[in-house]
A protein has these predicted regions:
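Long, contiguous binding/interaction regions
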Residues: 1-119
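A charge-rich, low-complexity, intrinsically flexible signal that marks solvent-exposed coils, linkers
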Residues: 40, 113-150
Length: 150
């Protein structure tokens, strides 16, 4: 997966062959969290990503959208409450191409990065709440004199 996320998608015209079942199986080993599915006779890879908060899913979908624009390879993105489902396939060949697995790897990387950012933000917020709990403000807040109101 590490090498896939560093690759760039190549332009894909209708004369490029779909991946064979053996090629799909080999690439799928690099993206084990992704499910290979067939929808309306077209193979695709899909994964549902979970989030603690709805806005984090929106951020993720936006980041994947930007990656898709940069690579000129676009997924189907379904945003649900605290979940985002991505479906990758190559429309011009009505099936799977290496580009789909490249974008799966890039999507996974974007997800892990967002989880790290969210975790770091939560740690800072928890530390702040421990230092100044909302129910126990510092004594100087609300004091009318220069002394602590304790």
């Amino acid at each position: 997966m590490d090498t896939l996320k560093q690759e760039h998608c190549v332009p894909c015209t209708g004369d490029v062959p779909k991946l064979s079942d053996d090629e799909i199986q080999e690439l799928h080993m690099s993206a084990p969290m992704w499910e290979v599915a067939e929808v309306d006779g077209v193979k695709q890879i899909q994964r549902t990503f979970d989030f603690d908060r709805y806005p984090d899913g929106l951020i993720f979908a936006s980041r994947v959208g930007r990656l898709a624009q940069e690579q000129d390879h676009h997924p189907t993105i379904t945003i649900l409450y605290k979940k985002v489902k991505l479906e990758w396939n190559t429309h011009t060949i009505k099936g799977l191409h290496r580009n789909d697995f490249v974008m799966a790897a890039k999507s996974d990387e974007a997800y892990l990065k967002l989880l790290d950012e969210t975790h770091a933000k939560n740690v800072v917020q928890e530390a702040s709440e421990e230092s100044f709990p909302a129910s126990d403000s510092p004594g100087w807040i609300g004091s009318t004199s220069g002394e602590n109101a304790q």
